[in-house]
């Protein structure tokens, strides 16, 4: 998950460097950012659910090899169409691996601590994204934007043998049949309301999160913040989310997501609006970035645990995969809308005010969850 987090977020780190080298505006590279997100959506919709039939371990191993090699290849892209194509294929590999890593973690965790376990595991995704931001701040000026891609793909290849040796296959309860149409079961047995709410939450928060990771360095730069400080602010968002996940995960397990996560999303909304007022003030920008990390990255780590906890083993990869896929649709919309707003010269403060709306939508969905059925997993999981 560390390398996946690095890979999934790295376009936001290298877009300014690519734009300078190719002599284009950052907004013109929106299609390359969107391509990776579309690939992750396709992978989550169509590749990840295959694990419920063929096993999670095999699918994760294949997916990691795909995104590792294609990430390295992206460093040698010479044109926008080539960059878009490589990021699309890389995203498919990422989208296939991520839901199954979450599912494996959930299946080997006690039911009462499942949200905490998934949040802790997924925090390594945020560490990878934050590490990538720090690495990019140092590598891009010295070695160029391609060095960031090569280092990311190289790390994935180095870690692959460890996955091959240590990763277990998923737990399958005795006598539990594999569903022929697992997607249909997301809306059966009283799951319809929760499934819809989970999808709304994932859509809103990933729309927000990927808007920020794609355009935060650019928007902060437009306010007068230096390139290095802007990238480091993105790292603060990720590391704050890691710290928050270890606190919020146990609270979610104890009190339920509808009592904990709305407050986190409210913090995010206030800090997103606030960072638009920071101007070139670096300290205030970093404080706001920390609050944003709590309410977006930290909350998303817990969102993954909520989805994994709710769905039984036989459809867990499908449930988590489709929730992430719907979220990926939001993650495409966020950067695209951000690119449109930037290209039309909308005031930066206005952009951040618009960006404060999705966390409020996610908070509302969790509040509605209080009327939904219990989130406990199927009896076979306990």
Over which residues does each language-model region extend?
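Extracytoplasmic gate region of multi-pass secondary transporters
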Residues: 11-12, 190-246
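Extracellular/periplasmic helix-loop-helix junction of adjacent transmembrane segments
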Residues: 12-42, 229
